Amino acid sequence: MTRSTRQDTGQEQFLTVLSRDEALARFEAALFPRTIPTEELTLADALGLALADDVMAPIDVPPFDRSNVDGFAVRAADMATASEALPARLLLNHETIACGVAPQIPVLAGTATSISTGGPVPRGADAIVMVEHTQPTEGDAIEVRRGASPGQFISNAGSDIARGEVLLRAGTVIGSREIGMLAACGIALVTVARKLRVAVLSTGDELVQPGDVLRPAGIYDANGAIVSAAITENGGEASFLGAYPDDEAKLEAAMREALAAHEVLILSGGTSKGAGDVSHRIVNRLGAPGIVAHGVALKPGKPLCLAVCDGKPVVVLPGFPTSAMFTLHDMIVPLLRRMAGLPPRTEAKVTAKVPLRIPSELGRTEFVMVSLVEGDEGLVAYPTGKGSGAITSFAQADGFISIEALADNMPAGSEASVTLFTPHVRVPDLVVIGSNCTGLDLVVGILFRAGLTVRSIAVGSLGGLAAAKRSECDIAPIHLFDAKTQSYNAPFLSDGLELVEGWRRMQGIVYRPSDIRFQGADADEAVRAALADPNCMMVNRNQGSGTRILIDQLLGPARPDGYWNQPRSHNAVAAAVAQNRADWGVTIAPVAQSAGLGFIALKEEHYDFALVSARNERPAVQAFLTALTSPEFNEGIERMGFTRPG
């Protein structure tokens, strides 16, 4: 196939897909060594930046011998025999030494001077006695009833910081503690590595900025805000320059202008080889050496493009949010920190068991975002799923695990090393794994306002039951209909689990109101009409969900067109029908109403909870059960269109 033909089909192929390490090595070789720009700033303005040079202490701290307590400056030799039975009597000098007051009268043998905490120790004194160990007596004197040793309650000059010692070393990130040390030495200005000026652009005809009206087939631009925030979090000065359509001439002009005014250019989108992806073609025209890596054997993140243009790094991140954020944090942020003179981030790792088999693609190192929960035998890592286009998979994950390029899966039960996104594992108060529902969000909101943290992982009813049996959660939301007993949920429980009633929600067939095939029909008639029309396409639900079980019972052996389209949520089903990508599906009444769809009632299902009996007495579980019976919950659940049993 010729180059022009490949371009016409809109599917060019990556010329060379590199390993992560090889791509980084090429990028670093083109970037470094380089001089780090510096500037002199006040302490307040230097907060969060890295020192460019070692800072030497210009003075001793403290700059004089000072008292650590309120009391009296004395000579220790006068206290040699002092005791309760035989107190030492000392005449008081006629001065009181407060903070900031230079002493005028020396302490001679047999005398003492009143001194406050922080006051400079007078000449002749070599110890401080606490005021509570003394007693005033006649003749303007005190009695001391406890002995003292030389140096007692005195901080000598330079005991904290000595003049000429290295106070802070180059590369130290300036925080509140460092500012305190610098200020204590009288230092007002420091030389720091200047913040990197980073230009951020988003690309794509489909992008709409947050706050604007979402047009058909448009999506809101999340990458611009996310990338800019990540740059700021890591010591950069991000300038978001907006989103640009896939117009090669306009985009090139914007990229050249951005690169001229900034030290780094980061784009998202337009780096794949599909139709409309033009960013990578422009990059090679911006300066030498140009692209050093385009295509990295990572999942997510394969389309990553790395370039250096006349000494300035240019990065084109994948357009999908999870791909963009992972490659940014894993590969780009460490280099930006190095360019800004900042130390590497500290990576924390924990070991966790993987409860489910995770398939992987041979030939690419795959990074899987996971949420951590506490099981009976330690931490358990649940994949967040949702794909590289999902916003929440990165935001809600605790960390990630890696599957090597030579493996096609990670078996269930494997022990995996989890690289954490934060220094510590955030163990939630309550773990809920199973089916999702907007009603569940209401309960979680009540618990959140009560100060409890809840980890909710949507894996479907059967997945939730399996997690509950393995004691990997406290509660599993389920809605499973048993055709044999004609009842919900209870027949599916095993030993160690108990049923907690939740609420009722009406499941039904959804269709576009204009579709005459379903108008006025009941559920049986609607299904017969759909199965009789080969052009009538359905949208199913994912394996393991309660809705999928209901659909399979409804269809029997039939597998109509669209059966293998299996989204994981009610909202996805409604969207498919509303957008004419399917003609019918099964979802709950509130979702159908929100989407403006026709609705044929099918069955009132029971959305209940399988509770792990051994965890019943946990405070968070009790709080959950209390929330289920609260007036706030009952009123909210009715507003959502659900009903409570009884």
Task: Please give the residue ranges for each predicted region.
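Helix-rich terminal scaffold detector
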Residues: 1-21, 188-317, 321-327, 438, ...
